[in-house]
Amino acid sequence: MRPKISIIGAGFVGSTAAHWIASKELGDVVLVDIIDGVPQGKGLDLLQAGPIEGFDVKITGTNDYAATANSDIIIVTSGAPRKPGMSREDLIRVNADITRDCISKAAPLSPDAVIIMVNNPLDTMTYLAKQVSGFPKNRVVGQAGVLDTARYRTFIAMEAGVSVEDIQAMLMGGHGDEMVPLPRFTTISGIPVTEFISKERLDAIIERTRKGGGEIVNLLKTGSAYYAPSAATVQMVEAILRDKKRVLPCACYLEGEYGLNDIYFGVPCVLGAGGVERVLELPLNDEEMALVRKSAEAVSSSIATLKQM
């Protein structure tokens, strides 16, 4: 029997993730949305791409969570984007309500699933998903670092004039302006990135990475990134379903790692069939650790706001 992947939210990120999951034949896909006709239409359209692209999986579009029962993976992309004039607290409130609704309906139907959160504010919504689902920490994980690291690697490749495939990089922290790219753990085919790029240019790349999502929002005017976020999500899905033991930066629940507790935070981890199989603690220097603590303070503040609601 093929694995079953349920995607909650049939917007750009959800439907694009569904496409790549189908094209890789990672499993059968259930696309869920509250808007009648949207998941059904997108699901049917995607199904009809199968004979052309050469994939053969079952794709179901529905408004009914019953169709998600016994999923191996649940991906949550549903959420409102931050609008002009909207406070951080307003965004947390709106998306917390959506997340509670999605998880409370989906999790009981798939008690052995791994939940991958994609909605924002990412670290806070992942924390909420763990609370609502009651799942163990290894089976609730947030997609942020894979995307942010991909942006970082892209900008480094552009600057160095080399293939993006040869960039190895690591990034930590919350999904936002306080993220922590780590140049000391960044190489080009094993060669330190500083052999290719000056500190000044590297600092500019780090700042562009931090603002990467906003740069695309500003260019699009209406909407936000979806190709790279969905590709990042599918990379995590593949690592879990194929038990690849990938070392990827993900939002993981910490209990003492890096001196942090009761927080979802972007750290390198081993991702496999058990979900987050272990968190890797890098030997950070004082400067890097200070940036991690600053990022953790921002995430903790957001989680504290959630708890007060």
From Swiss-Prot:
GO terms for biological process: lactate metabolic process; tricarboxylic acid cycle. It catalyses: (S)-malate + NAD(+) = oxaloacetate + NADH + H(+). Its EC number is 1.1.1.37. The keyword ATP-binding does not apply. GO terms for molecular function: L-lactate dehydrogenase activity; L-malate dehydrogenase (NAD+) activity. NAD(+) binds at residues 9-14, 33, 95, 118-120. The active site is at 175 (proton acceptor). Keywords: NAD, Oxidoreductase, Tricarboxylic acid cycle. The keyword Kinase does not apply. It holds the Pfam family Ldh_1_N. Substrate binds at residues 82, 88, 120, 151. Catalyzes the reversible oxidation of malate to oxaloacetate. Belongs to the LDH/MDH superfamily. MDH type 3 family. This is Malate dehydrogenase. It comes from Roseiflexus castenholzii (strain DSM 13941 / HLO8).
